[in-house]
Structures are given as structure tokens and as C-alpha cells.
Amino acid sequence: MHDPGEHGHGRHDHDHDHDHVHDHDHDHDHVHGGGHRHAHEHEHAHEHAHGHEHGHAHAHAHAHAHEHAHGHTHEHWAHPGLFSERDAPKDRDFSARAFTVGIGGPVGSGKTALVLALCRALRDRMPLGVVTNDIFTQEDAEFLHRNKALPPERIRAVETGGCPHAAIREDISHNLVALDDLMDHVAPALLIVESGGDNLAAQYSRELVDYTIYVIDVAGGDKVPRKGGPGITQSDLLVINKTDLAPHVGADLGVMERDARRMRGDGPFLFAQCNRSQGVPEIIDHILSAMRRATTTAPPAK
């Protein structure tokens, strides 16, 4: 476990390899004055005309008919929310669809690098399946193919054709089709969904995933954790990636740690360098622990 005193809250002028985990199973002195948030969701109608599924290749989700001039309706969040108030995982039959992990975060934060690292670490331990989301390309799926993350038949690509968060929360149908296709053809024990890059307000529907990981990176500056948003405050695990860039961008890892703890309360977070697999074993521990809890308490298969 990480001792927050290891690197303090001063400036960091040298490289850090923070592959330790903050799981907050012990008491902390938290600054709760500004940390309490409440999420208010307002439902809006969605009339989406969708494309079609292309076998094992990819799914299209295009031609959205919307009510707002800017493109489509959104959930409106008055506050970033508390970790303790996040949506609870659904009790469901995991024989119908395997335990599903959703990985989200801004563009360039390292989501695909994390997916690749997870595939490399877990593919010899259990059968996997991956669904990627991009707006108009299959770039992330192609990256996984080039790097031989998994056999091609275990990867599906969804082209959302619009804002990525809609495909993981408001209209999850195309991702569900891709996940069901993987279940039918390769019978994975663990499924991973990678969202397209989006903003701090993006969060997965619990109808789609059982466990959420939100990835931010140091290159965005040490202010990112305190900006909040459901991804920061209510993901099951927050990953602060690319810690090696801290001295190059003037980011203070101590400040990021302090703010992540303040914003997340008891919610776990950790530092990582996913492209070097630093922190990845700890991420896997969190995933497998959640998977064991969910599958041992799941209702019996029908």
C-alpha cells in the first residue's frame, strides 16, 4: 500500500515511477468541505437512427436525429457526484454475458495502452474479448491488431458516428451487440470495453459494464483531478497515467494525489505508466477482486 508521505506535496523535479495503489481501506484525514457533490441526471429523449452490424468487423452507429441544435441531447450534471453515490453494479446472470470492464478517459490519456497491457497480462490466464469505440475510424482496434493484443476474432470495433459518451451511456445498443457477438463466437470469461476519448463528464451505463476505470494523464496538468466530473469522482478506479511526464510538464504528483483523494473520498486511485506496464498488476488486482465479488453473489443462471 502507498504511504502518502513518500512524495509529499512539494514540487517534483525528477522522474517518478508511481506504480503503487491507493485503495483507501484505511482512514484518512479528508478535506470534505469542497468534496461533497451531488449528481443530478435529467433524462432527455433520444431518437437515434442507427446503421448496421458488419459481422466480426465493426458496428456503425450513425445518423442521429436529435432535439438540440448542437447535435444531440446530454445528461446534465449539476455536480460531479460522490464515489459513495455512484451507480451500483447490476445483479445479473454472468453466463449470458461475462463480467465487463469499461475503460474511459480523455483523448490521449492512455486508454488503448491500458487495454493492450491488460490483454498481454491476462490472455494466458483467461479467455478475453475487447470492444473498442471510435467516432469515424477503427484506429484503436487496428492498434490492438498490430500489437497482437488478442487474436483478431476476439476484438470488435464500434464506430459511434457521434459523441463517444452516447454510445456508452445513453444508447448502448451497438456495444451490447458487439459484446453479445463475442459471447456467441469466442466465449470470453472477461470482456473489456474501451470508450472513445471524451470529457470528464463521460461515464458508463451500468447496463453496459460492471466495473469502470477512468484514465487521466499527467500531461493534462496537475489540475485535472480537482476539476471533478463523474469520471474522476465516480469511476470504480481512477488511473493517473504517464507519471514519467510530470517533470516535463511541470505537474506536481503530490498535488494530484491530494486532489484525487479529496475528490474521491474512499474511492481507489493509482499512478501508472501503462505503456511500460507500471501499475498494471495493481489495476488487474482491482479488476479481478471486483469480478470475484460480482460473480460469487450473482443470481443463478436461468
UniProtKB/Swiss-Prot annotation:
The keyword Transmembrane helix belongs to this UniProt entry's keyword annotation: no
Region (Disordered): 1-76
Composition skew (Basic and acidic residues), residue ranges: 1-32, 40-56, 64-76
One Pfam family this sequence matches: cobW
This protein's record includes keyword Disulfide bond: no
Coiled coil: none
Record GO biological process: urea catabolic process
A GO MF label: GTP binding
Residues where GTP binds: 105-112
UniProt-annotated location(s): Cytoplasm
Keywords assigned: Chaperone, Cytoplasm, GTP-binding, Nickel insertion, Nucleotide-binding
SUPFAM superfamilies found in the cross-reference section: P-loop containing nucleoside triphosphate hydrolases
InterPro entries: CobW/HypB/UreG_nucleotide-bd, P-loop_NTPase, UreG
Main location: cytoplasm
One GO cellular component term: cytoplasm
Family: Belongs to the SIMIBI class G3E GTPase family. UreG subfamily.
The protein's assembly and partners: Homodimer. UreD, UreF and UreG form a complex that acts as a GTP-hydrolysis-dependent molecular chaperone, activating the urease apoprotein by helping to assemble the nickel containing metallocenter of UreC. The UreE protein probably delivers the nickel.
The protein's role, per its UniProt record: Facilitates the functional incorporation of the urease nickel metallocenter. This process requires GTP hydrolysis, probably effectuated by UreG.
PANTHER family according to UniProt: UREASE ACCESSORY PROTEIN G
Protein name, as recorded: Urease accessory protein UreG
Protein's organism: Sorangium cellulosum (strain So ce56) (Polyangium cellulosum (strain So ce56))
Organism lineage string: Bacteria, Pseudomonadati, Myxococcota, Polyangia, Polyangiales
